[in-house]
Amino acid sequence: MHRSYRRVVTGHDKNGAAIIESDQVATQTLERPNRPGVRLTNFWITDQTPAEYDGPTETCLGPLTLKPPARGSVFRCVEFMPEDPEVMAQLSSEDGAAAFAEMGAGDNVVRGGRHPWMHRTDSVDYGVVLNGEIWMLMDNEQDDVLLKAGDVVVQRGSNHAWANRGTEPCTIMFVLTDGVTSSGEGKGIPLRNGN
């Protein structure tokens, strides 16, 4: 069962005193039938760096997209229910592409990847596992890692997928920041889908 999140946003009154501008349940959520058991909730989005702290009170408007805006960031929570192995066995990267297309990121899926939702974003993502446990799958199985409550991950534009193979839900808080590759560093980061 997915939960609701109270979101408190601070600001300033006309005299510059600190106030609470908004105190309500976060409403920008996304659940998709072609990505069963996963729910995303956005809390805040910025569209520039440095970010404005005296701008609008509500930034989570329009459709929920996977990646942050250019030069921006997204603060979000993702809840992963345990995966059903029978359902997973029937899915392919084409199913993953369809699910990610609903978030404006169909091209982010790794075609023929190890997991239907293996993907990559051009971003640096900071994640904190709040509860449960989850496998972070990489291109090669020997690099997979089991993350547990209290673990943090810094995802730097690499192919990955999330797989909850346990029996309890897993919740991860993320801050996604727009990113670029450093040219000439010799990291050998492959172009996405051969492009």
Label each residue range with its predicted role.
Residues 1-60:
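N-terminal leader/capping segments at the start of a protein or of a new domain
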Residues 21, 136-137, 154-155:
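A generic structural signal for residues embedded in beta-strands
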Residues 48-60, 65-69, 178-194:
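Non-heme Fe(II)/2-oxoglutarate
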Residues 113-121, 126-148, 187:
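A short beta-strand-loop-beta hairpin characteristic of the jelly-roll/cupin
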